[in-house]
Amino acid sequence: MGTTRAPWHTPPRSSPMTIAFDAPAADALARDSELLSAVLHEVLVEQNGAALAREVRWLHEAAAELRAGDPAADRVLVERVAALPDEQVEPVIRACALQLQLANIAEERERVRRRREYDRTGARQRESLLEAAELLRRDGADLAAAVRALHVELVLTAHPTEATRKSVLDHQLHIARMLDGLDDPRIGATDRRRLLADLRESLTLWWLTDEVRRVRPKVEDEVRRNLFFFTHTLHEAVPQVLDELERTFGVRVGGRALTFGSWAGSDMDGHPEVGAEMLSRTLSLHRTAALRLLRGGVDALAARFSHSRRHVTVSPALEASLARDEAELPTAEVLRRVHREWEPLRTKLGFVAHRLSNMLDPVAREPGYADPQELRADLWLVLDSLGSPNVARGAIRRLLRQVEVFGFHVAALDVRQSAAVVQEAVAALLPGYRQAGEEEQAQLLAEAIAEDRRGLDRRPEGAAGELLRVLDTVAIAREAFGPAAVPVMVISMVHAPSDVLAALWLTRRAGARLRLVPLFETLADLEGAPATMATLYGTPVYRDSLRAEGDRQTIMLGYSDSGKDSGFVSSQWALHVAQERLAAQAAERELELELFHGRGGSPSRGGGRTHRAILAQPRGSLSGRIRITEQGETVSARYGDPELAVRSLEQTLSAVLLASAREQPPVPGAWRAEMERMSERSRAIYRALVYEDPDFPRFFAQVTPIEELTALNIGSRPSKRSAGGVEALRAIPWVFAWTQSRVLLPSWYGAGAALAEGPLELQREMAARWPFFQSILSSLEMALYKADLGVGERYLRLVEPELAERFWPRIEREYAQVVGRVLEITGASALLDDAPALQRRLSHRNPWVDPLSHLQVELLARARAGREDAREPLLETITGIAAGLRNTG
């Protein structure tokens, strides 16, 4: 039986040089896919021989025939996988995985192409700043007020299951640039040959690079990985998107509209390698990266700004500044230039560069800048003397934007530690604390905070002692680098007011006045969050601390653990209700509330379309301010290319502007009651399977590669908080394991009966008019479409028959019920019917992902039988499937 071929199928139909680069724009994705496939085919033949390329083709064709409905192809696929010679197993896996990653690159170039076309024609792109401005004008909103209130902070995390090495990211970025060059219709045959040769070279180097790390990454590797995105793409993208915001809304946009944070190197929670030394090292790496970028930007300006005194008017302030620089910087290279007297702007920029260099030199005797404001003041002196508005809006404005947003630290570091460790530190230091109950502990802490003493009499051992050393480092760093470098302490797993008051006391005693952010993660803690905050707001010393922060309270909401606790639907509703109550509570007290969303990549951890998720926030919970985590697994997809980064940033900013400035109607009581019912029912179904059946942990361990994941060197953090089963497992590897087996159970299980038992017409009304419910259905559709229980069933050969017979039928029934009900509500004939392009892309991936899944099952069987040679190729399948589904945890 025939099947529709994916545009990146093997073997290629033509050689790279014969591909039509002048094809219509509509065919550009197919052209890029064909080109990448053709070049990979050449690389495979050159590096490993034609036999490997043939084997890859046969596996792909068998998987495609099976997808097209040919049952005989199933046997062929199974037999070919089992019969693969040992020496071909790993190369075949790598070839399939590389095809999938090349598909990702081709699709990303298509996104860039579409954005450019909208920009060229002036047409309005969905989820753009232009669309947001038009919608707000139509509603009569105050655009200037909306922009002035805007403050979006994106916090990059180090993801425990991020599967892409930085070396691979470099190759991917280079290949994307080659495709971009080939897209230019003006290039001739010589340039095309050169670009194709570069493309072939990059792909060969990638093929010869280990996809899987041979050793577990150090924390510093994760710090450098985050810095890669800041220095390679975001540094370029941010000025563009802020300029676009200013141009579209006609309002001056300051640097506070968009800022960045990072957890890599400062997140201590469950991470023994992160401590005072690592924090200090991270601060140094951030500062060095920021200063080098700024120095490079200033050097580039100096090379261009050759203005003569005869053609520009030098302001008295700039003249005075030059005189001061000459006195303070006698060794500056610019003083040796012949033309310095006649080129004042270039001379000034030379002094600026020298000051930045001094800041990079630990033994420099001449001054640098005390803070970014001093640098901005010098750049404004140059700007004021330019005279030309065209130049003023160009390179120097971009540099000023970069100084505003990234400062001397690139991204603010959040210190994070669990409430349990914070409490342990206090118990070791405060007499009588350990024996007291919650109310008495809160009272003891309030009294101790009111004393306002500095210094600590003694130091506990272990994690508690390391926390105190970190706080000492923070106090020093804030003095040296400014408060913006380390502004926040996130207290994870907050259960009670004393958890936050304990952190307040510790930070005060250590002299580190950090903004405290309680993180509510479990379902019970989310439900109890308003009561916890009410107690804190009623505690005078805590209220005084908020007053010192401008009456601003930041609260973080954890999507991961609540989803693992209660399932997707119940978790989403609990988060929604918590936000409503916390927002109302803050408004009553005239506090400015900033919600910090700990979203992940998968739907079960709050992932999905960022724009839609922001629009689904409850009424009154957004007032222009929001913090959002960008998990390691999604960062490369959203920010791996400067133009993709611009698009991702504008989608986030436009959603926050719309959600903040547009009036939202109250949610009808019937809708709330239905969501409450669905939440309770889905939670009961989910927990009955995951937590209440004592045999489920054994089934989970056998039907997914969870045990093998712990051997994969893709994150520095341990996958478990403590010894134990599902309860002890972190939410991220829990989701990753189910993604690998293609079941994606955490993203949909429990929703079937919960939806099916409710009134269909009411649910259709909710789907038509309520953004929150639309977001739930959208996330369910995506997860259900990516899930494949036919492939997941293959993993049952690894499971004890009795366990398979008990659990698999329950999973199949629930899946069928969820799919059926979602289609009934939406009125569609198939999942993702309203997104045919996405449907096609995901469907075209399956014939490459399926062989990887079959190979993974075979290799898991071998590994569990004790075959050591199965380990390396098994880990390759894990990274390949993650790339194919574009999901880890």
Label for each model-derived stretch:
Residues 12-446, 463-466, 514, 607, ...:
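Often metal-dependent polyanion-binding catalytic scaffolds in large enzymes
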Residues 43, 58, 71, 108, ...:
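Carbohydrate-active enzymes and regulators
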Residues 153-159, 164-165, 169-176, 189-210, ...:
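Structured alpha-helical segments in the cores of large, soluble enzyme domains
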Residues 341-347, 351-354, 358, 408-501, ...:
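Active-site cores of enzymes that catalyze phosphoryl transfer or operate on phosphate-rich substrates
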Residues 700-889:
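C-terminal accessory/interaction regions of large nucleic acid-associated machines
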Residues 274-303, 509-684:
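Catalytic or ion-translocation cores adjacent to nucleophile or general acid/base/metal-coordination motifs
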